[in-house]
Amino acid sequence: MDIIGGQHLRQMWDDLADVYGHKTALICESSSGVVNRYSYLELNQEINRTANLFYVLGIRKGDKVALHLDNCPEFIFCWFGLAKIGAIMVPINARLLREESTWILQNSQACLLVTSAQFYPMYQQIQQEDASELRHICLTDMALPADDGVSSFTQLKNQQPATLCYAPPLSTDDTAEILFTSGTTSRPKGVVITHYNLRFAGYYSAWQCALRDDDVYLTVMPAFHIDCQCTAAMAAFSAGATFVLVEKYSARAFWGQVQKYRATITECIPMMIRTLMVQPPSANDQQHRLREVMFYLNLSEQEKDAFCERFGVRLLTSYGMTETIVGIIGDRPGDKRRWPSIGRAGFCYEAEICDDHNRPLPAGEIGEICIKGVPGKTIFKEYFLNPKATAKVLEADGWLHTGDTGYRDEEGFFYFVDRRCNMIKRGGENVSCVELENIIATHPKIQDIVVVGIKDSIRDEAIKAFVVLNEGETLSEEEFFCFCEQNMAKFKVPSYLEIRKDLPRNCSGKIIRKNLK
C-alpha cells in the first residue's frame, strides 16, 4: 500500500494551507527570546516567497543549495521552498568549521549558500581561497557586507509574490535533500533523501507517537539533523499539529518552554535528560501537558526511572539513523514497553539480527542489527555519488546493514548492545574516530594517534586522544587542544590527552582500541 498517494512536498504544503488555513503551524523562539508565529496559510506563503527568491537567483530543479543556519524560521522556509521548485537542500551542521564545511560544499556541488552573519567570514574565505561551485551567498541578517555575490535573504524574499512562480514537474522519487552524516570512514557521506522519504517520515513518525492536529510538538534538536526534520517537523506538519522550534537547548529554560507553549510531545537525548536532572528541583517540575517524550539511545534504567518520576513523563524509545530516515525500531503507540528494549520493528519494516555471514540469528544471540525497507521510500535512496559506499551497506533487496550490534527476545523486542565501529556518540552528535585521527595526525610533532570514546556521565561519551610523539619532541596540553580547536568543530575536540611511547596493536598492525578504553 502506498500511503503517500503520489503527493510530493509541493502538493503537501498547498493542501495543508487549504485544510488548516489560519491554524498555527510553526512557532520559532530565538536564543534572545524573540518569538515568530506562522499559520499554515502564512507559512505556505513564506515558503512560496522563498521558492521565488531562489528562482530569481537562478536556482532550478536539481540544483543544490546549502544551508548553514541555527534553528530559525528561515531554515523551514528554505527547506520547503527548495522542495517546491525541485531543488535540493544540503544542510550543514552549524557547528562545523571551514575545512569540514568546504568539503561538504565541494562534494555536494552546492552552487548557493544561505547562512547568517556569524558564519559569513568563514564562507567569504572559502569563496576566495577554495575550489567550489559556490557562486552566491544569501545572508539572513539585515546588515550586508559590501561584497559582490552576496544578497539579503529577507529583503529579497519580501520582494517576492506569495504565489509560486516556477512549478516544474515533480515526482515523489525526486531528491529533496542530501544530508551529510558522519560515518566510520574519514569523511561524511551524503545521504540522499527523496520527497517520498520525507512524506513517509511524516506519516510514520506521526503514527509512532499517535500525533493529532491538536498536539504541540516542541523540539530543541538542531534543524540540520534527521531527528528534527523527520521525527519532529514532518510529523507535526503531516498531522496538522503545531511545531515549536527552539533555537538552542538550555536546561534552565527547557521546562519553561514546554509549559509556555503547552507542548504535548517533545524529544530528548541522554545529554538533555542528565542536564535536566541536575537542575534544582521545582514545584513546577510536573506542571506540563507532555504525553510522550521521544527518546534516543542510551540511558541506564536508574537514570530513566529517576527522570520519569521527577518530571512525571514517560519515554517512547526510538532507534534509527540518518539512513533509515525515521526510528525504524521503537515503542509502538498503545503497546507495552519493555525497558531497556529499543522496541519492535515499525510498520513497513522488517528487522533481523544477523551474523557475520548475513544469516539470521535466533533470539538471545548478539549480531548486527539489519533493517529491510524500500530504498528511496522508507529508507534512504543512496549515498550521493558514492556507489561503493552504498553497496557496502545497502543490498539490492532493501536490506540495510546498520553496523550496530544487538539482539532480540522471543517476543520480537530488540535490544541495542554497541554503536557502530569507530563512532563516538557525544551529546547527540556522531563523531568519527578516523576523521579526528586524520586531522590530529597533521600536527608536526605527532607520530601516531588514536582516539576513543570513554564513558561520560553527561554527554554519553567523552573523546580521549592517545598520541605518540616524534623522537625528541614535547607537546603541552595547551598546544594540543589549541591545535584541535583550530581544525575541527568544537564538539569534536577531545576532552583528554594521553602521551604514550607506543600504541597497542595486533599481529596485523591494527590498533587494539578496546585496550585503551
Curated annotation (Swiss-Prot):
Has UniProt tagged this entry with the keyword Ligase?
Answer: yes
Task: Specify the domain of life of the species encoding this protein.
Answer: Bacteria
Q: Where are the transmembrane segments?
A: none
Molecular function GO terms recorded: carnitine-CoA ligase activity; crotonobetaine-CoA ligase activity; medium-chain fatty acid-CoA ligase activity
InterPro entries cross-referenced by the UniProt entry: AMP-bd_C, AMP-bd_C_sf, AMP-binding_CS, AMP-dep_synth/lig_dom, ANL_N_sf, CaiC
Q: SUPFAM superfamilies recorded for this chain? A: Acetyl-CoA synthetase-like (SSF56801)
- Which CDD domains does this UniProt record tie to the protein? FACL_DitJ_like (cd05934)
**Gene3D superfamilies listed in its UniProt record:** 3.30.300.30, N-terminal domain of ligase-like
- Name the enzyme group at the top EC level: ligase
Q: In which pathway does it act?
A: Amine and polyamine metabolism; carnitine metabolism
Question: Which GO terms fall under biological process for this protein?
Answer: carnitine metabolic process; fatty acid metabolic process
Q: Which family does it belong to?
A: Belongs to the ATP-dependent AMP-binding enzyme family.
UniProt xrefs under HAMAP family: CaiC
Give the protein name, as stated in the record: Crotonobetaine/carnitine--CoA ligase
Q: Which organism is it from?
A: Escherichia coli O81 (strain ED1a)
Q: What is the lineage of its organism?
A: Bacteria, Pseudomonadati, Pseudomonadota, Gammaproteobacteria, Enterobacterales
